[in-house]
Amino acid sequence: MAECKNIMVYVETAEGNPVKVGLEMLSPAKKLADKVTAVVIGGGVADAAKEVAKAGADQVICVDSEDYKEFNLDAYAQVLVELVKEENPEAVFVGGTQDGKDIAPVVAAKCNTGCASDVLDIKAEDGEVIYTCPLYGGTVLEDVKIKTTPQIATLRSGAFQKVEDPTEGEVVAKEVKVADDVIKAKITESVKEIAETINLEEAEVIVSGGRGMGSKENFALVDDLAKLLGGVVGATRPAIEDGWVSKIHQVGQSGKIVAPKLYIACGISGATQHVSGIMNSGYIVAINKDEDAPIFDVANVGIVGDVMKVLPVMIEEIKKIKDCLLYTSPSPRDRSVS
């Protein structure tokens, strides 16, 4: 039975596409509400809105304007506030992305309501919605009830699954103007840094290295394994502080919260700040010479050993398996057509 009449879900976009957590949030919203209204804001986001409609939203409000081509906290937050006034939702879900974590508290303040952060689970009891949120780096979980409406919540990426067998909703285009005096800061110029770009939050395979890798030269093995598995490289804060990889690779509380299908932790002890960022991974493999390392408490498979001896063997064996699969795969001529 639905606990809410209407839940609004703000679906962020990146390079014209809805981000993963945006689509994931539709699932808990549909379980709780009679109607799920998604909101897409930006410039040239009409196609993204259609994709959201196909992912399970009953209605998608598309605010497509060149005024919102570049993300602006004041403008985007005010657009959401105006739509909240129109739609009167009982709750607003926002993805726990860098921008989402900025928007949610601003919207909550403007609406004079409460905000639950980094939500891992949502349930309904006795007509109330309860948000489960981590504290102290994930070592403690607390249940949060918000007595005011609309309830605002940021949901962690990977904590929820996308809607299964969704029905397609409708897309409604709306023009929402924001007064100039609302915008406190404007982007006058954008300069893109010429550097590597990775998307840890969307990656299905992540191979991460910690200080246990020993040196920048040794860290190259992490990169080799990631490439072999078609994944991306992650790292702990100490490995980044030592200059082995750039900060863009940081996984954990002060980096990116990730939820890959496979996470391989190499030479990582398992500090709370790091573990809290990988808890939603589908399968965790840990390699560490210390059998008492905390990382083994969350790993599905633990390998106790010298990472510099284990990784070369893993890489070699995976290469053999891939070569074998390639060799045994039938050529087009070998395939029969019935």
Predicted regions and their residues:
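N-terminal glycine-rich FAD/FM-binding segment characteristic of electron-transfer flavoproteins
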Residues: M1-L326
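Conserved small/polar residues in nucleotide/adenosyl-binding loops
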Residues: Y327-P332
